[in-house]
UniProtKB/Swiss-Prot annotation:
Gene it is expressed from: efp
Subcellular location: Cytoplasm
Entry annotated with the keyword Protein biosynthesis: yes
Name by which UniProt lists this protein: Elongation factor P
Family: Belongs to the elongation factor P family.
Amino acid sequence: MAERGSDIRPGQILDHNGSLYLVVKTMHTQPGKGGAYIQAELKNLKTGAKYQERFRSDGYVKRAIVEEVEYQYIFGDGALLTLMNTATYEQVSISADMLGEKGVYLKEGIILTLSFYQGQVVAARVPDYVVLEVVETESVIKGQTASSSYKSAVLENGERISVPPFIKVGERIVVYTVDDTYYERAKD
């Protein structure tokens, strides 16, 4: 399916130069001279190599036709992850490398989205928002307004992110996994 270059978004899978690529990042650029373009960071789904590609905003790119299916994470043994289709209860194993650095958000029961291309799993992603518990946080000095209003916190998965000063140890927070940032307190 052809799509305008200006419509490329992170998370999409493109069929470009005979290979499948995952769009990791995009940036729209309007130079003073010449036409606008999209600077995209692409990841080759076969080799894992990343590279930069420039697409004209008014040009067209071929988007791969993929089927996205939700799978529940059951367990992992290091290199392989075992997942279960939430509709058919069919189990599938995928490489842990498919999630890359987002694998830190895996915990039993989390729902992942798998992308299938011609019957093969080509990509996997965690939800955009996950709920995690704060296990360690810095103390805040009352009245400290001259510096940043965020403090560092360690989550149950070992990740360190910045949180507002009112967050305490033991609280559950929502983390935006796209850029690994605090979103809000969990509404349990």
